[in-house]
Amino acid sequence: MAEITAAMVKELRESTGAGMMDCKNALSETNGDFDKAVQLLREKGLGKAAKKADRLAAEGLVSVKVSDDFTSATVSEINSETDFVAKNDQFIALTKDTTAHIQSNSLQSVEELHSSTINGVKFEEYLKSQIATIGENLVVRRFATLKAGANGVVNGYIHTNGRVGVVIAAACDSTEVASKSRDLLRQICMHIAAMRPSYLSYEDLDMTFVENEYKALVAELEKENEERRRLKDPNKPEHKIPQFASRKQLSDAILKEAEEKIKEELKAQGKPEKIWDNIIPGKMNSFIADNSQLDSKLTLMGQFYVLDDKKTVEQVIAEKEKEFGGKIKIVEFICFEVGEGLEKKTEDFAAEVAAQL
């Protein structure tokens, strides 16, 4: 058997673009015959797949798998090079099979996935064979799984175009409430897919971030007010400049002060004290809404619900708690969008041809 040197492996790798170990194995199987090794790699699709690996895969699909008992929800993103392949039935099946494999084997990382076994072969080899068949570079970019704790429940949603997927987990105070909450969680996932909140609640916001955003908000509103004053349109009154941007800033002392101010106004208006309890909650809600505009933009709980824009997600959950007879606390959500954070590689036809010559 011919000796397989590092120089031979390097030459084959540069010629075919295949991986180092694939080149070494091909040379071993062909007794060092370079041309036969090239042909073997082509027959296996390994050279073709590896050669494509420098092409950015920024299209693709997001897939969601929710276990039958609603205790585990997995979301994954697998990228392709073109939107055309993302609509390919074989690629769609690949994304579903991979997501189910991730969930059933409790995999935690892409590295762990590649070293796992699927259908009797290493996943890395399985993916290479799919690349060779489909004809484009495919990349498992990321995945995540949420688990339900005791009396917990999970659910998920995949948007019809397959480009946005969401999974969510909630903690409840009984299995009965958890079971009743399944549909609610799916609907909240739909809301997340549409509104893309960045945070779960105002409690997750950093105070320095909030303070900086407040300055930006005031500057934006003042600029709009300046334009409205110029136009003098009676249908577009000036914005009221809020004192705060988030409930993160509304301490107990601030809320108490606001309530006392409302009482003073009611007294000045001559409203009898016996009806104050009916008026104050609504005015306090208005005060909080006016001073938490950042929450309504960035946080799930503070956003107005897409299925009922008169209520926030937090208010909808509170109503369901009364209906179901128990507590429902959203613990975590994860939203993936295809290509999020990736920069698509664009070339004109002439440049693409030149790059291949």
Curated annotation (Swiss-Prot):
Keywords: Cytoplasm, Elongation factor, Protein biosynthesis
One annotated Gene Ontology cellular component of this protein: cytoplasm
Coiled-coil ranges from the UniProt annotation: none
CDD domains assigned: UBA_EF-Ts
Source domain of life: Bacteria
Segments of this protein annotated with the region Involved in Mg(2+) ion dislocation from EF-Tu: 82-85
Stated family: Belongs to the EF-Ts family.
Name of the protein: Elongation factor Ts
UniProt organism field: Campylobacter jejuni (strain RM1221)
